[in-house]
Amino acid sequence: MTSLHSKPLALKNVTVTDSFWRAEQELVRTAVIPYQWNALNDNVPGAAPSYCMHNFKAAAAQNKRKDTQGKAFVPPKYTFRGFEALPEDPANPDPDKFYGFVFQDTDFSKWVEAVGYSLAHYPDPALEQTADQAIDIVCAAQLDNGYLDTCYILNDMDRAFTNLRDHHELYCLGHLVEGAVAYYQGTGKDKLLKAACRFADYVDERFGRKPGQLRGYPGHEIAEMALVRLYEVTGEQRYLDLAEYFVTERGRQPYIFDIQADENAKRDADANYKPNTDPNRYAYHQANKPVTEQDEAVGHAVRAGYFYSGLADVARLADDQDLADAAERLWRNIVDKKLYVTGGIGGTVDGEAFSYNYDLPNDSAYSETCAAISLAFFARRMLELAPKAEYADVMESALYNTTLAGMALDGKSFFYVNPLEVNPYACHKDSRLRHVKPVRQKWFGCACCPPNIARIVESVQEYAYTVAEDGGTLFTHLYMGGVAKAELNGTAVELDVTANLPWQGDGKAVVRLGGDAAGTSAQAPARFTLAFRLPGWVGDESAAAAAITATGESESGADSSRVTREIRDGYLYLTGEWRDGDTVTFDFPMPVRMLAANPLVREDAGKVAFVRGPITFCAEEKDNGANLHLLHADVEALLADPSAAKVEEFDFHAGAKGIDDKGQGEVEDVTRRMVKLEVPAWREPLPAAVAAAGEGAAEVPAFAPLYAVYAPVKREPATATLIPYFAWANRGENEMTVWLRG
């Protein structure tokens, strides 16, 4: 098992020059990070207040009062029992009280994580100073014992860790660790890292299976994967042990959530409390049974993705086959039965959760942005367990589609929910679709998604490469332009990559040898393996492998075929004596694929979706007119001649006015080069009277029978214009659909 393991390259060892991802990172650096800092400080007009930095300042001020007053200091009484605290007067919040959701601290942690990634490659003294000042405030809020969660610091520490199910202290720890590690790696500054270690040490003392410890685990997972990261940075075994404990203790009986609920009901004299006896009651938390007994992805999709990521991490580092098998079972259930064609997961608004197998609604899809990001986390860690192209294919789809759809092209508004079909009229009128927004929002009270997008975009290079634990193989999982640095069998190697994805499948990688640790000449050949993913979207593994050629594979003379090839699990392994300046070129076919869903996916029966390369496409009303449910792909024409689907590069012009007085849906004028598809199609004509009503016909009486005797549908020839899914809703409120009727 261990021979398959690999680890990602350090952030500073991969430089992104890729035109696509460099533009995304530049957008995050110049627009999103400053915008989100304003949001954390409640300085975005029209946006829901965050209260994040308000809470840290309040906790820091309380600590200062405690230091000044000494024994005379009276700690705050417990006044907050809910999930979200709001000020009585929103215009004048009390500077000493906690507001927002119980996990509000994490908004800062995710923001500073993105800042750390950005500063690693783009030094910005002003941004770094802002972050340092914010870190000073956060660290000033920490208690002497290491505890750091403003919800309880400002609401009676006697209640700390008494409601693990609902009040997310361990979730806050996880994000604090992630942010602290990123900022340390990006800047070399360890103030926040030391604070995170102190909090982790406090938790390590309190939790576990030893006498006197709390046999608990996070209600909302992420601490598991974060503690692994802390272990990898510090080398402290106790952090890995704590992560393993959280993973393996979860779901064991008696349930800690039940125990604490009973204790809290007694403490609060809650006469209405009734114990929950549903045997499946903690499926929402992935805690209905121990993970080694789980075989279906259930519950809150983001929590699940984070938990499965930590599971895969621990399986790799503990070399635990049972945990690895559990991770693979859960992966298979997601990919085979619960994955949207856009790389999204979690189809139901009820609990922001996975539904039953094959239940993948389109217009009511939840498909939270954070859930797609959690899937990318999980996929990356499955790749570290074992290099299989399927993991990278899914990771790539999640990154290019749902993750990027979560952010407007100007970086100033965001989707929490990512449907695959939108009728704005229904969104405004149908309470069942209350969660679906036809345009992006400026901010959210529960603002987990915007900073999550920022942190994964700024660290996307960490998803592109891993190095085998034996040090002999460099894996390329994502094709993006840049320079990757690794040590392979003792030789410093640089891979200088140019790539034109996601719009074209071509590019090359130039091998640069920098010598070994002893300073051997850079020109000396070195033996190692370069393994390149064969993208599933090519459609044929052999065709994908044939699209890759390397110098040294078929030379004449004594050096004939000094580099050999082998295909394993969707990767092409090129092994041999590499020379400085050798190149690996690739030119992957990028056919337009017309996909059909499994027949058990009822919502998609008789429909098709279009994918090219890693990009899923959609139709918007702006290009195709209203009533997209009457637009059909001409599948017969496409099957007869696949080339009938035309690929066209074009300049996509984004820009829209807000749809309300808060400016929701507003997008600044932006132009981005991308690809659109022109697909043979046909339309069902509307009844003449309805068609005459024109725009807004849904709001006027339809002067045609509601029902009529069946007659064959007339076909009006049309061409469907499809744009990348991530670009939808950047031109104002309009209909959208991913799946077209066939």
Question: Can you say where each PLM-predicted feature lies in the sequence?
Answer:
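Beta-strand-rich binding/interaction modules
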Residues: 524-554
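Hydrophobic core segments within long, regular secondary-structure runs in both alpha-
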Residues: 18, 25, 37, 112, ...
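A conserved hydrophobic secondary-structure block that centers on an alpha-helix together
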Residues: 155-233
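Structural helix-adjacent loops and short alpha-helical linkers that scaffold large soluble proteins
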Residues: 4, 9-11, 15, 119-132, ...
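Low-complexity, Ser/Thr/Pro/Gly-enriched N-terminal "stalk/linker" regions
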Residues: 1-107, 132-151
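Solvent-exposed loop and edge beta-strand segments that line ligand/cofactor-binding
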Residues: 5-6, 64-69, 86, 90-108, ...
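Well-ordered alpha-helical scaffold segments within catalytic/enzyme domains
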Residues: 21, 112-125, 174-189, 223-235, ...
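C-terminal beta-rich recognition modules with glycine/proline-rich loops and embedded aromatic residues
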Residues: 13, 19, 25, 243, ...
